Design a protein with these regions (language model features):
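A domain-level signal for the structural core that forms small-molecule/cofactor-binding pockets
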Residues: 1-139
Length: 139
């Protein structure tokens, strides 16, 4: 947690582009929302050509959906949406009209990492001191 899922047409992103997008999303998340690098997950899923639609017409849309711990204010989430959109457009060359980016809130108590319920935003240090040694993380 967080989990970002990037859905794109098969063949539309090279390995290098996926790497840049994954690193960029990770950096945006850490810069704006905080947290621990090792817990930022980015997963790419691909659909076959002809199976993506935009406005009811076959196309090649890209969708980036993120689930983050609830508790960040809207200004942070808006900045994240904007930064991830710019990143995806710059790296992939996709038209803004074919890109959708969303961020959803998940209560920390509804998510686990390494078998441990996540802390609320701002409580990471105490959580890390408690479970960090169990997960092999420095406190």
């Amino acid at each position: 947690m967080p989990l970002y899922q990037v859905l794109a047409q098969e063949g539309s992103l090279s390995a290098a582009q996926r790497d840049r997008i994954a690193q960029g999303i990770t950096d945006v998340h850490l810069d704006l929302a905080g947290g621990l690098r090792q817990f930022v997950n980015v997963v790419f899923q691909h659909y076959p050509a002809g199976c993506g639609y935009n406005a009811g017409v076959v196309g090649a849309p890209m969708v980036i959906g993120g689930n983050i711990r609830a508790g960040r204010d809207q200004a942070i989430k808006t900045a994240m949406l904007e930064a991830i959109s710019v990143l995806a457009i710059e790296v992939s060359g996709i038209s803004p009209k074919d890109l959708t980016v969303s961020i959803g809130d998940v209560r920390a108590s509804n998510a686990m990492e390494g078998g441990h319920i996540l802390p609320e935003p701002g409580e990471e240090a105490a959580w890390l001191a408690k479970v960090g040694p169990l997960l092999g993380l420095a406190a």
